[in-house]
Amino acid sequence: MLSLRLFLPDIWTADPARLNRAGVPLEHQGSRTKPEMAIEEIDRLCAAGVRFGCVLADAGYGLSAPFRQALSARGLRWAVGIPRHQKVYSTDVELVFPARKRGPSRMHPVPDQQSVPAHKILETATWRRVSWRRGTKGGLAARFAAMRIRVADGPAQRIGGRTAQHMPGEEAWLIGEHRSTGERKYYLSNLSADSSLRLLAAAIKARWVCEQAHQQLKEELGLDHFEGRSWTGLHRHALMSMMAYAFLQSRRLTAVGRKKKSHRPTTTAQSASNTTGHS
């Protein structure tokens, strides 16, 4: 756990007196969305030399086109949840200048197909059972489907008499997950086009570790137990919770290392003096 940021809703940022009573610093009193704050933290961590493989986020962040685009602009790999109605195009979409019967020709090209919801385009996809890792009770598996698409997150454009739709944006993976409970989840990822379905599933499900860390911080290490109304007090409390988590995690990793060492097979080498040779 490297970073935590406090999100202040509009009811707070619109009340300067309330912010001042709580001791919120001026630079944090402005209104910010959660995706904006996440990008700020990622920039701060990258500037500090932190390296990571893939940015993971739930649909609360994944539905934000500026968030996804900011990650791609920074050269980062990402895998994020999205709502089922997120619009996408097939990869063969083209931009054309449709002929008009009357009036001047169009100044801007438009897509030659309509965008469709994510869940619709995956209806014809092949779903396969994939195991992404082993758990305490065996392999963790679900049914997945994936296809390359263009995300409909470009500028909005009115096409003909229809309502405006977003232009094709970045090419990415659209992934669907069909859980044993019947629930379906949808994701986008900019992992490389040659990524296997198992790799995509493993990247998506790695977010479980983050969720477990948050749960442990809140329930076992007291992050949720702060009852004050001071910016400084809250941040001191959060820092202590994070330090406790870092300590426990280091102990956990040390114990795992010892366990692996103790299970390592030992080999006995026969000494040269006991080896029978030929003259």
Describe the residue ranges of each PLM region.
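Polybasic low-complexity intrinsically disordered regions
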Residues: 1-84
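Short, conserved catalytic/metal-binding motifs centered on acidic residues
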Residues: 55-61, 78, 187, 208-217, ...
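Short gly/pro/ser/thr-enriched loop/turn and capping motifs at secondary-structure boundaries
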Residues: 85-90
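Extended hydrophobic-aromatic, low-complexity segments
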Residues: 199, 210-217, 253-256
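A short, flexible helix-boundary coil/loop motif
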Residues: 8, 15-30, 34, 39-43, ...
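Extended, non-catalytic structural segments that build the interaction scaffolds
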Residues: 181-208
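Low-complexity, glycine/alanine/valine/leucine- and proline-rich hydrophobic stretches
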Residues: 167-172, 177, 200-204
